Amino acid sequence: MEEIIKIYDNKIGISFHWKDRGINLIQLIFCDTGFHLTENEIETFLEKVIDSKNQKNCATCVKGENCKSILLQTPSEKVSMAVSQIELAQIDDLLKGTLFQIKMNNYLVNLCKN
């Protein structure tokens, strides 16, 4: 893991920068899937997560919060993911935590320049 700079992680995944590839793209990995996204794309993804929270499970579903009945749109128009309510909450945390750390790091870098 020496080739990366970790930004944030939780139970479902991790976000990081590759050391040798600059910091414009952020690698997000969760649900066995990797995304290379800009900060704006992560914000868009977070909006899609919030929209997906309005989807409900079937009333008769025996799996409850573990049922992968929520269709999560990704920043790529051609890719959607089936996730559970639990996974959706963890993805929400991963995206929010990543954005918080990026914004905090940018703030500190700008503060130290002055």
Regions found by a protein language model. Give the residues of each.
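Positively charged, low-complexity terminal tracts
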Residues: 1-114
